[in-house]
Curated annotation (Swiss-Prot):
Function: This is one of the proteins that binds to the 5S RNA in the ribosome where it forms part of the central protuberance.
Name this polypeptide is given: Large ribosomal subunit protein bL25
Record family assignment: Belongs to the bacterial ribosomal protein bL25 family. CTC subfamily.
One GO MF term attached to the UniProt entry: 5S rRNA binding
GO CC entries: cytosolic large ribosomal subunit
GO BP annotations, alphabetical order: translation
NCBIfam families in the record: bL25_bact_ctc (TIGR00731), PRK05618.2-2 (NF004132)
Gene source species: Flavobacterium psychrophilum (strain ATCC 49511 / DSM 21280 / CIP 103535 / JIP02/86)
Subunit structure: Part of the 50S ribosomal subunit; part of the 5S rRNA/L5/L18/L25 subcomplex. Contacts the 5S rRNA. Binds to the 5S rRNA independently of L5 and L18.
Keywords associated with the record: Ribonucleoprotein, Ribosomal protein, RNA-binding, rRNA-binding
């Protein structure tokens, strides 16, 4: 999985006054969990844009003053309900030998015969939770729709891989090709025409 580097500074004070001052200065207060002790730090709000405002998933390298560096994933985010300004971020530290749970985006590949015939592709699950060692975290979960005919579905079992575990029930639908209204109407009209009685023969 691709990684983003965040450069920050350790926080000496974590009180409300200090937190407000950080935000007024354009910084975001953060906490890194998962190690022996939580690490409180802050970074410029602009540093998080490529991490937060994207559909892609990334791991993070947190570099703080003093030469300290931590591998992590974003665990939680708080944003202002009106301005969408980032208020706080929680991270979870990664270790090479310890599995981590993370949401990974689904990527559609291939061309569906059902779509070519007028069906509508519906993506039911844009992201799926997976559990894996950090080195095995995928950037995407590829869903190949090449075999999908009209009315067919792809379940999470089709995306299984020995390097990671998908944390969803086996009957979870990832995507499906639904019959469009136009195609359904055409099929109904064709069926009616086939059942209609033949016209009377002239004498």
């Amino acid at each position: 999985m691709k990684s983003i580097t965040i450069k920050g500074s350790e926080r000496e004070s974590v009180g409300k006054v200090a937190t407000k001052a950080l935000r007024n200065a354009g910084a975001v207060p953060c906490v890194l969990y998962g190690g022996d002790q939580p690490v409180h730090f802050s970074a410029d709000e602009r540093a998080f844009k490529s991490l937060v405002y994207t559909p892609n998933a990334h791991t993070v390298v947190i570099e703080v003053e003093g030469g300290k560096s931590y591998n992590a994933v974003m665990q939680d985010i708080q944003v202002h309900p009106v301005t969408d300004k980032i208020l706080h971020l929680d991270f979870y530290q990664l270790f090479e030998d310890k599995e981590v749970t993370m949401e990974v985006p689904v990527r559609i590949i291939g061309t569906s015969p059902g779509v070519l015939l007028g069906g509508v592709l519906r993506l039911n699950s844009r992201k799926l939770k997976v559990k894996a060692l950090p080195a095995n975290l995928p950037d995407f979960l590829d869903a190949d729709i090449s075999p999908l005919e009209m009315g067919n579905k792809i379940y999470v079992t089709a995306l299984a891989n020995e390097k990671y575990k998908i944390l969803h029930p086996e009957n979870t639908v990832v995507c499906q090709v639904r019959i469009s209204r136009a195609a359904m109407k055409a099929a109904q009209e064709a069926a009616k025409a086939a059942k209609a009685p033949a016209g009377k023969k002239k004498k």
